């Protein structure tokens, strides 16, 4: 069995599995390739639900502090159990469980969202405020938007995780009116208004784009 963990993920497993099952715990996101063993099924326990696997390839996003719990199947078969509901997935299907209790089953069309295993953060028509939540997950820095005008700007693009948060923000900055201020000690990045100023006279002019 192969497991690949995403950023800020906690994964625990026993040093020796039980004789009749394989149980692990996950808080975060991981990609699994589970070897088949009908006599010893594989279980993933999370704060929002449980996955039962016989032999398959799937992605599980189950951060305890997130609003959505997602299971995406690429090969094989899994059973997702949430709030007493059993959902059986087929390859190329995803099930989303929302904190309001809604369960949504859909066909996977966009596989870029799973390219985090390659070190890529792929964004598709996402609002800036939601992108900042994603960046916080991947980069670790807390990002505070002080320029509320840009919260609903939408972006599509790919960012290399290894290049860091500031590099990713500078790419977004080309198309939106904000500046970046970083507090390295507190690991906080502030997104502020864009402005121009005359240094010696201390006259500030805020401009909108």
PLM features: what roles do these ranges have?
Residues 1-199, 203-205:
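A residue-level detector for the "anchor" residue at the start of short, highly conserved motifs
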């Amino acid at each position: 069995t192969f497991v690949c963990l995403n950023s800020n993920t906690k994964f625990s497993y026993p040093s020796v599995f039980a004789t009749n099952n394989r149980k692990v715990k996950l808080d975060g996101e991981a990609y699994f390739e589970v070897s088949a063993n009908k006599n010893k099924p594989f279980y993933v326990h999370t704060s929002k639900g449980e996955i039962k696997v016989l032999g398959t390839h799937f992605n599980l996003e189950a951060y305890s502090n997130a609003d959505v719990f997602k299971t995406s199947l690429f090969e094989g078969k899994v059973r997702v159990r949430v709030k007493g509901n059993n959902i059986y997935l087929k390859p190329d299907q995803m099930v989303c469980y929302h904190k309001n209790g809604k369960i949504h089953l859909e066909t996977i069309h966009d596989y870029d969202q799973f390219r985090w295993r390659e070190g890529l953060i792929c964004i598709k028509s996402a609002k800036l405020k939601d992108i900042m939540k994603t960046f916080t997950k991947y980069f670790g820095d807390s990002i505070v938007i002080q320029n509320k005008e840009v919260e609903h700007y939408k972006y599509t693009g790919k960012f290399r995780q290894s290049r860091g948060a500031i590099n990713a923000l500078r790419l977004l900055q080309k198309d939106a009116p904000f500046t970046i201020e970083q507090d390295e000690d507190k690991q906080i990045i502030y997104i502020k208004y864009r402005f121009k100023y005359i240094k010696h006279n201390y006259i500030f002019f805020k401009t909108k784009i």
